[in-house]
Amino acid sequence: MGMRMMFTVFLLVVLATTVVSSTSGRREFRGRNAAAKASDLVSLTDKKRGCCSDPRCNYDHPEICG
């Protein structure tokens, strides 16, 4: 194998390693983001139940009750 061929193989290995490591990190981040959004929705639903039934809270926080 010549030097040019060895260098090309080296670059391909580096590129493949970079692509695999960057895409696996994105999946984990997307999963955490989705979990955080779901948690926010659950807490908002709990606030809605308690606040919307109370007229004073409903008046003070119209953004929750809509």
Curated annotation (Swiss-Prot):
<dbReference type="InterPro" id="IPR018072">
    <property type="entry name" value="Conotoxin_a-typ_CS"/>
</dbReference>
<keyword id="KW-0872">Ion channel impairing toxin</keyword>
<feature type="modified residue" description="4-hydroxyproline">
    <location>
        <position position="55"/>
    </location>
</feature>
<keyword id="KW-0379">Hydroxylation</keyword>
<dbReference type="Pfam" id="PF07365">
    <property type="entry name" value="Toxin_8"/>
</dbReference>
<dbReference type="InterPro" id="IPR009958">
    <property type="entry name" value="Conotoxin_a-typ"/>
</dbReference>
<dbReference type="GO" id="GO:0030550">
    <property type="term" value="F:acetylcholine receptor inhibitor activity"/>
</dbReference>
<feature type="signal peptide">
    <location>
        <begin position="1"/>
        <end position="25"/>
    </location>
</feature>
<feature type="modified residue" description="4-carboxyglutamate">
    <location>
        <position position="63"/>
    </location>
</feature>
<keyword id="KW-0582">Pharmaceutical</keyword>
<feature type="disulfide bond">
    <location>
        <begin position="51"/>
        <end position="57"/>
    </location>
</feature>
<keyword id="KW-1213">G-protein coupled receptor impairing toxin</keyword>
<keyword id="KW-0732">Signal</keyword>
<keyword id="KW-0301">Gamma-carboxyglutamic acid</keyword>
<dbReference type="GO" id="GO:0005576">
    <property type="term" value="C:extracellular region"/>
</dbReference>
<feature type="region of interest" description="Key region for inhibition of alpha-9-alpha-10/CHRNA9-CHRNA10 nAChR">
    <location>
        <begin position="54"/>
        <end position="56"/>
    </location>
</feature>
<keyword id="KW-1015">Disulfide bond</keyword>
<keyword id="KW-0008">Acetylcholine receptor inhibiting toxin</keyword>
<keyword id="KW-0027">Amidation</keyword>
<keyword id="KW-0800">Toxin</keyword>
<protein>
    <recommendedName>
        <fullName>Alpha-conotoxin Vc1a</fullName>
    </recommendedName>
</protein>
<dbReference type="GO" id="GO:0099106">
    <property type="term" value="F:ion channel regulator activity"/>
</dbReference>
<dbReference type="GO" id="GO:0090729">
    <property type="term" value="F:toxin activity"/>
</dbReference>
<feature type="region of interest" description="Key region for inhibition of alpha-9-alpha-10/CHRNA9-CHRNA10 nAChR">
    <location>
        <begin position="60"/>
        <end position="64"/>
    </location>
</feature>
<comment type="similarity">
    <text>Belongs to the conotoxin A superfamily.</text>
</comment>
<comment type="function">
    <text>Alpha-conotoxins act on postsynaptic membranes, they bind to the nicotinic acetylcholine receptors (nAChR) and thus inhibit them. This toxin (native toxin Vc1a; hydroxylated and gamma-carboxylated) blocks alpha-9-alpha-10/CHRNA9-CHRNA10 nAChRs (IC(50)=62.9 nM). In contrast to the non-post-translationally modified analog Vc1.1, Vc1a does not inhibit high voltage-activated (HVA) calcium channel currents. In vivo, in contrast to Vc1.1, Vc1a does not show analgesic effects in rat models of neuropathic pain.</text>
</comment>
<keyword id="KW-0528">Neurotoxin</keyword>
<dbReference type="GO" id="GO:0035792">
    <property type="term" value="C:host cell postsynaptic membrane"/>
</dbReference>
<comment type="function">
    <text>The synthetic peptide Vc1.1 (a non-hydroxylated and non-gamma-carboxylated analog of Vc1a) has two types of targets. It blocks alpha-9-alpha-10/CHRNA9-CHRNA10 nAChRs (on rat receptors, IC(50)=19-109 nM) (with preference for rat over human receptors) and inhibits high voltage-activated (HVA) calcium channel (Cav2.2, Cav2.3) currents by acting on GABA(B) receptors (GABBR1 and GABBR2) (IC(50)=1.7 nM). It also shows moderate inhibition on alpha-6/alpha-3-beta-2-beta-3 (CHRNA6/CHRNA3-CHRNB2-CHRNB3) (IC(50)=140 nM) and alpha-6/alpha-3-beta-4 (CHRNA6/CHRNA3-CHRNB4) (IC(50)=980 nM).</text>
</comment>
<keyword id="KW-0964">Secreted</keyword>
<feature type="modified residue" description="Cysteine amide">
    <location>
        <position position="65"/>
    </location>
</feature>
<feature type="region of interest" description="Ser-Xaa-Pro motif, crucial for potent interaction with nAChR">
    <location>
        <begin position="53"/>
        <end position="55"/>
    </location>
</feature>
<keyword id="KW-0629">Postsynaptic neurotoxin</keyword>
<keyword id="KW-0165">Cleavage on pair of basic residues</keyword>
<feature type="disulfide bond">
    <location>
        <begin position="52"/>
        <end position="65"/>
    </location>
</feature>
<feature type="propeptide">
    <location>
        <begin position="26"/>
        <end position="47"/>
    </location>
</feature>
